[in-house]
Amino acid sequence: MNSTCIEEQHDLDHYLFPIVYIFVIIVSIPANIGSLCVSFLQAKKESELGIYLFSLSLSDLLYALTLPLWIDYTWNKDNWTFSPALCKGSAFLMYMNFYSSTAFLTCIAVDRYLAVVYPLKFFFLRTRRFALMVSLSIWILETIFNAVMLWEDETVVEYCDAEKSNFTLCYDKYPLEKWQINLNLFRTCTGYAIPLVTILICNRKVYQAVRHNKATENKEKKRIIKLLVSITVTFVLCFTPFHVMLLIRCILEHAVNFEDHSNSGKRTYTMYRITVALTSLNCVADPILYCFVTETGRYDMWNILKFCTGRCNTSQRQRKRILSVSTKDTMELEVLE
């Protein structure tokens, strides 16, 4: 299938994506490496939450490592200069990150809901073994759902009159192909709408339980409520604009006439590309939310960073502290037992 050239979009991508992606790389790669260390140690302490956090950080890190390729692509005004196989792999990891992230965020929300609302029930759902099984299932299912990108031809050549040259596009072409429309509609429903509703319901129930629990101090209540709001806002801001524009794109381009593209369709595509760039910020938000928002998370992360940079004190006591994890729940919601 051919692609229609949108000259203005190439110019926008040339400046927008490198700026956003460079920021994400600088912040998210060290943050997610630290988060992997912290969550791994938590998982060793029989924490099911550590399993979900580890998977979330791994997904973010894998995507962040592909961003240099996308920076080169957009800096060259949407011209893919690498092999088609790298295009397929980069697109695969990008969408794997989008929808594995929403899945793991949902798992964390459900886990916190069970811990707070039903602290004396459903113990088997809050074991490390169960969390490991769920995480592996998510990785396998997301691999299957996104595998279509590994065998479909993801590169297409378009000619732009303004540039008087050909451009090799990677995956995101205009208009969408039929298989892309069907896949995106499926993703929007199962990978965004269902997780969003689940997170909203779980967080609302947790908020109600915390608010009416007299055994919890006001300071602790405020911290928990702040965390719940942060989780919801981060999910909505990172993923809602993208999926709204993706849904509009699918509707407008479902029966588009290639020879007669409307201005509204092109404007929608421009807005969609902006939301793609903003979605990458979830790689920054995730480690901040789930490792820095609590006192124990910040302390363990800081010790690991000092250890990695060689500035850690050589005393045996501090070394032992680096390799230990507080038994206090990272999310600090277990106070309601």
UniProtKB/Swiss-Prot annotation:
Residues 154-174 are annotated as: Extracellular loop 2 (ECL2). The record marks 142 as: Required for activation. One of its GO terms (biological process) is response to acidic pH. A multitude of proton-sensing residues, which include extracellular histidine (His-10, His-14 and His-243) residues or triad of buried acidic residues (Asp-60, Glu-142, Asp-286), contribute to activation of the G-protein coupled receptor activity and pH sensitivity. It is a multi-pass membrane protein. Residues 43-46, 119-126, 213-216, 294-337 are cytoplasmic. The record marks 10, 14, 243 as: Proton sensing. Predominantly expressed in thymus, spleen, lymph nodes, small intestine, lung, placenta and peripheral blood leukocytes. GO terms for cellular component: plasma membrane. Residues 1-5, 78-82, 154-174, 253-264 are extracellular. Belongs to the G-protein coupled receptor 1 family. Pfam families: 7tm_1. One of its GO terms (molecular function) is G protein-coupled receptor activity. This is G-protein coupled receptor 65. Changing residue 231 to L: Increased lysosomal pH; increased lipid droplets accumulation. Changing residue 172 to A: Decreased proton-induced G-protein coupled receptor signaling. Activated by a network of residues that connects an extracellular-facing cavity to Glu-142, a conserved charged residue buried in the transmembrane core of the receptor. Protonation likely drives conformational changes in extracellular loop 2 (ECL2), which stabilizes movement of transmembrane 3 (TM3) and a series of rearrangements that connect the extracellular-facing cavity to Glu-142, a residue only conserved in proton-sensing G-protein coupled receptors. Activated by BTB09089, a positive allosteric modulator. It is found in: Cell membrane; Early endosome membrane; Late endosome membrane. Changing residue 142 to Q: Mimics the protonation state; induces a shift of the optimal pH for activation. Keywords: Apoptosis, Cell membrane, Disulfide bond, Endosome, G-protein coupled receptor, Glycoprotein, Membrane, Receptor, Transducer, Transmembrane, Transmembrane helix. Glycans are attached at residues 2, 79, 166.
